């Protein structure tokens, strides 16, 4: 069973980039305890002060979907969405190859 990866690109409302970044910290304990969670990253654009990208990795699509369908995750997402200028662009996939040190 391959790991599930989701990337999402977001455009923060003007002046809300740090609030978007901070919002990711609000649910860290819940996320860490989620079954199958491996890692999450948040990246800011070097070119656009309002653009943020994030990625999350779970050990399976099943565990990712269970987390996504959890009401606590839904509430967290609604809080995030309130800080964004529009809906995120999503990319869901299966880990095909990885290189790490």
Which sequence ranges carry the predicted segments?
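Glycine-rich beta-strand-turn "strand-cap" elements at beta-sheet edges
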Residues: 1-5, 38-50, 76-101
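Short, surface-exposed ligand-recognition loops at beta-strand->loop->(often short) alpha-helix junctions
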Residues: 11-22
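An amphipathic, aromatic/His-enriched active-site/gating alpha helix that lines ligand/cofactor pockets
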Residues: 26-39, 57-91
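Residue-level signal for secondary-structure boundary sites
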Residues: 16-18, 62-64, 98-101
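Short, well-ordered beta-strand segments in beta-rich or mixed alpha/beta enzyme
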Residues: 3-10, 40-70
């Amino acid at each position: 069973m391959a790991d599930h990866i989701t990337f999402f690109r977001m455009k923060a409302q003007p002046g809300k980039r740090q609030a978007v970044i901070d919002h990711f910290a609000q649910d860290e304990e819940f996320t860490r305890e989620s079954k199958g969670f491996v890692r999450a990253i948040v990246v800011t654009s070097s070119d656009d002060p309002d653009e943020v990208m994030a990625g999350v990795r779970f050990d399976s699509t099943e565990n990712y979907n269970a987390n996504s369908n959890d009401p606590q995750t839904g509430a967290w997402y609604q809080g995030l969405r309130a800080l964004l200028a529009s809906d995120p662009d999503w990319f869901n996939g299966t880990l095909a190859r990885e290189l790490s040190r």
